[in-house]
Design a protein with these regions (language model features):
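Canonical positions in the second alpha-helix
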Residues: 54, 87-88, 122, 157-158, ...
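Structural marker of alpha-solenoid helical repeat scaffolds
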Residues: 57, 90-92, 125-127, 161, ...
Length: 327
C-alpha cells in the first residue's frame, strides 16, 4: 500500500489484517503511522497491537522496536521494554531514542545509577544536537535524585557546545542561584558575551550572577545591556529594579517597575514594590495609591492594609490610619 495513503485507508487495512481478512501488505512506514495515530488518540492497546504486528512483519526494524518499547514504558512494563531496547540497539546503536527510553525505564525501576552510567557513556558517542539532548536528559536524572551541582555541570557543558541554547540559558540562571556558583556563572557568561555580544539571555544571567554576589552596580549595568538588546525583557526590568532598590535608587526603580507593568500581567508584588519606593522617597499619597492597587489584586493579604495605614501614620494622620484598618 503506498506510503501516502490516507490514514483512514491504512486503519481499514490494519483492521482487515487483524480480523484475518486481509491479504494485502502494510509497509514499515504504514505501521509507524498507524502506531502514531493510536498513540495520539491515547488508544494504547490498539497502538501496542499495531506495534506487535509490525515487529512480527519487520523483526529487523529498529524504529518499530523503539516504538514498541515506548508503549511498554507507557504501560509500566519496564523490564519488557528493556529487553526490546536491547534488540533495537543491536540493529542501530546510534538511535538516540534507545538511550532516552532506557533511561526512563531505569528511573521507573529506581535504578538511577544505571541511568547515569548509561547516559554518561552515550554522551561520548554522540555529538551536535543529540549530545545536547542527552545532556539535558542527564540533567533531569540528576534533578530526580537531587544531585544539584551536577545539573549545573550539565548545563555548563551544553553551553560550551552551544552558547546560544535558550533552554540551557534559562535553566542555568536558576541553578546558579540555587547552587551559589555565581563566580563560575560570571566567567561562563562573560565568555559567551565575548563571542555573542547580542545574546540578551547571557547578559541577563551575567547580571543575575553579579546580583547573587551583591555587586549591584555591575548587575544594573548588565541588565541595561540586556534590555538594550531586548527592550521587552520584563524580567530584566524586574530584577534591575530590585538591584536599584538595594542601592536606594528608588526613582529609577519605580521607572523599571512601571515598565514591568507595561510588559507583563499586573502583580500585587510589583505594585507593592512601587508603593515601597514611593514610601521611601516620602511620597505617601503615591505609595498608598499603589498599595491599594496591590490590595485589589490580593485582597486577602492583611499586610498590604498595614502598609497603607503605615503611610498615614508617617504623615501623623492617625485617625485615617485607624479608620482604614477598621474597614
Amino acid at each position: 500500500m503506498p506510503d501516502n495513503d490516507d490514514i483512514q485507508d491504512l486503519l481499514k487495512a490494519f483492521e482487515r489484517l487483524c480480523a484475518g481478512r486481509g491479504n494485502g501488505f502494510l509497509s514499515e512506514d504504514s505501521f509507524e503511522r498507524i502506531i502514531d495515530h493510536f498513540d495520539d488518540i491515547n488508544s494504547l492497546s490498539k497502538a501496542m497491537e499495531a506495534a506487535e504486528m509490525g515487529v512480527l512483519q519487520y523483526p529487523y526494524s529498529c524504529t518499530l522496536l523503539v516504538k514498541k518499547a515506548d508503549l511498554l514504558i507507557a504501560n509500566r512494563q519496564y523490564k519488557r521494554a528493556l529487553v526490546v531496547l536491547d534488540k533495537a540497539e543491536i540493529l542501530d546503536r546510534n538511535d538516540i531514542d534507545i538511550y532516552v527510553l532506557r533511561t526512563d525505564a531505569y528511573l521507573a525501576l529506581d535504578m538511577q545509577d544505571k541511568a547515569v552510567a548509561l547516559l554518561e557513556d552515550a554522551i561520548s558517542q554522540f555529538d551536535g544536537d543529540e549530545r545536547i539532548d542527552l545532556l539535558f536528559e542527564l540533567a533531569d536524572v540528576y534533578d530526580d535524585y537531587e544531585a544539584f551541582e551536577k545539573i549545573f555541570d550539565c548545563l555548563k557543558l551544553i553551553l560550551d557546545y552551544d552558547p546560544n541554547n535558550e533552554e540551557a540559558l534559562y535553566k542555568i540562571c536558576f541553578w546558579t542561584d540555587f547552587t551559589g556558583r555565581s563566580e563560575e556563572s560570571i566567567r561562563l557568561h562573560l565568555k559567551i558575551i565575548e563571542d555573542f555580544p547580542y545574546n540578551d539571555l547571557a547578559w541577563f544571567n551575567l547580571a543575575a550572577a553579579y546580583q547573587g554576589l551583591r555587586l549591584f552596580e555591575k548587575s544594573i549595568d548588565a541588565y541595561q545591556y540586556a534590555i538594550a538588546i531586548n527592550e521587552k525583557f520584563d524580567f530584566a526590568y524586574r530584577n534591575m529594579a530590585d538591584a536599584m532598590m538595594r542601592l536606594h535608587r528608588y526613582k529609577e526603580a519605580i521607572e523599571s517597575l512601571e515598565r514591568v507593568i507595561e510588559l507583563a500581567r499586573p502583580e500585587d508584588l510589583i505594585y507593592q514594590a512601587i508603593g515601597f519606593c514611593y514610601e521611601k522617597i516620602k511620597n505617601y499619597a503615591q505609595a498608598r495609591f499603589y498599595y491599594r492597587k496591590a490590595s485589589h489584586l490580593n485582597p486577602d493579604d492583611a499586610k498590604i492594609y498595614l502598609k497603607v495605614a503605615g503611610t498615614y501614620i508617617k504623615e501623623s494622620k492617625h485617625a485615617q490610619a485607624i479608620k482604614y484598618l477598621d474597614t
